[in-house]
Amino acid sequence: MYRILVINPGSSSTKVAVFEDEKKIAEKNVSHSVEELKKFKRSMDQEPLRRKAVEDFIDEVGYRIEDFSAIAARGGVLEPVPGGTYVVNEYMVDYLINRSPVDHVSNLAAVIGYKLGKPHGIPCFVVDPVSVDEMCDEARFSGIPEIERKSYSHALNIKAVLRKVSREMGKTPEEVKIVVAHLGSGISVCACKNGKIIDVNNANDEGPFSIERTGELPVGDVVKTAYSSKHSAAELKEEFTRKGGLLAYLGTKNLKKALDSMETSRKAKLVVEAMAYQIAKEIGGMCAVLGEKPDAIVITGGMAHEIRFVRMITDYIEKFGKVEVIPGELEMEALALGVLRVLRGEEKAMDYRSVVE
């Protein structure tokens, strides 16, 4: 039996769980108040606070760090890598702390796991990090040579959904062709073929607008705003990635509240319908990329809990293929199972430095 500690930081909470083989034994979502977090300039500065939350959880459930076979940490914004499970080492930790191109809370998980496990000889792994890059060559072109499209997505949940759906079909991930739409605070819509994410919108910069992100914007207007604005580049980026989308239009990040408002507000109705329209349009594009009818179109993520919203999307796309809805995220299970496959010898963990150099 293998006992695995799973660490998954979110923007305002830290999810921690204990798995024994495939079975989840304990789980906690530790909330962090705005007051706690606002004093930290960078996400990485939160590391001691988040690590203490993990240590407190381990104490609460009656374990010591030495009791674990391995630690599974959510993968951060690393250099582009193929999907899979990677050993966390000093090189990866240094990259996440000092060189990651995006200040993202997911960068904390591997650092926390490594610091907890190393003194006791407990290995730490990341599974399908945010920067999984398996895009086909055609998908990389942006329109100008100086800029290449980047693959930043909800790869962990996307890959977990791919495995789940293919297993239910009695096939391997390499044998199915599916489109996955992960709908959370950010949105990733991707085409999966031969077990790989061959195209995906960058969840920060492209695609549909979401709960708090603008998605793709008209280039001319972005340039005009940037040069006429009194805001710094960092402030503008925050406007686009944390203060845009549904929040900018309706003043709320609560999709249910926005859906309820549709009964009395024409503006709310139009905004929510526009978001569904843009998601459906992105899904249609990914169906085209596959080159043939997909085996399934999967809608997943937090927004998939709202059946009314899902229906708005499926009204557009159901003619493209079978639609399956998997609400929420499979991240904790995906992390644990990715590490379990390595511990059982079913899959080999990769060395991050060897892959990127």
UniProtKB/Swiss-Prot annotation:
For this chain's UniProt record, which GO biological process terms are given? Answer: acetate metabolic process
Q: Which domain of life is it from?
A: Bacteria
For this UniProt record, give its keywords in alphabetical order, as a comma-separated list: ATP-binding, Cytoplasm, Kinase, Nucleotide-binding, Transferase
Gene Ontology terms for molecular function = acetate kinase activity; ATP binding; butyrate kinase activity
What's an example GO cellular component term for this entry? cytoplasm
Instruction: Please give the chief subcellular localization of this protein.
Output: cytoplasm
Q: Name one Pfam family in it.
A: Acetate_kinase
Give the E.C. number(s): 2.7.2.7
Supply the enzyme class, top level: transferase
Q: Which NCBIfam families match?
A: butyr_kinase (TIGR02707), PRK03011.1-5 (NF002834)
User: Mind telling me what this protein is named?
Assistant: Probable butyrate kinase 1
Source organism per UniProt: Thermotoga maritima (strain ATCC 43589 / DSM 3109 / JCM 10099 / NBRC 100826 / MSB8)
Gene name, Swiss-Prot/TrEMBL: buk1
